[in-house]
């Protein structure tokens, strides 16, 4: 597998509602894997599920790749040993949420945001 199937990609972009899920301003251009496909991640069944994806702008994708420590802290990247559905993500710069595999979000409270 090299990317999200069309059905999953559609869920991710519908959830984004035409806004980058990181900054909340720019139009999303790409589906970003929170847990990278490298290092064997593509063999895991949850790699190409909606909880592992964010619809993001090119500028935010570049920021994620260049500021990886920040990206892990904010849930935009997820370490290989973790399930993306269980790792909160900072969305639109202000909302901590959990992403599910149906294209939905669940708000997190203060205690849900502990670091994995």
Regions found by a protein language model. Give the residues of each.
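Short cysteine-rich loop/turn motifs with clustered Cys
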Residues: 4-32, 55-60
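Short flanking/linker segments adjacent to small metal-binding domains or redox-active Cys/His motifs
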Residues: 76-116
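A short linear boundary/processing microfeature
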Residues: 37, 73-77
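Short linker/helix segments within small regulatory modules
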Residues: 37-52
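Alpha-helical and His/Cys-centered functional microenvironments
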Residues: 36-37, 65
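Short Cys/His-centered divalent metal-binding micro-motifs
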Residues: 25-28, 50-74
């Amino acid at each position: 597998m090299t990317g999200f199937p069309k059905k999953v990609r559609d869920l991710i972009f519908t959830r984004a509602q035409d806004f980058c899920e990181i900054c909340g301003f720019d139009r999303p251009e790409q589906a970003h894997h929170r847990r990278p496909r490298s290092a064997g991640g593509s063999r895991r069944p949850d790699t190409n599920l909606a909880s592992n994806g964010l619809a993001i702008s090119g500028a935010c994708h570049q920021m994620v790749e260049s500021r990886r420590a920040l990206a892990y802290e904010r849930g935009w990247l997820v370490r290989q040993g973790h399930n993306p559905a269980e790792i909160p993500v900072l969305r639109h710069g202000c909302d901590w949420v959990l992403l599910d595999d149906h294209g939905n979000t669940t708000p997190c409270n203060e205690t849900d945001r502990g670091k994995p």
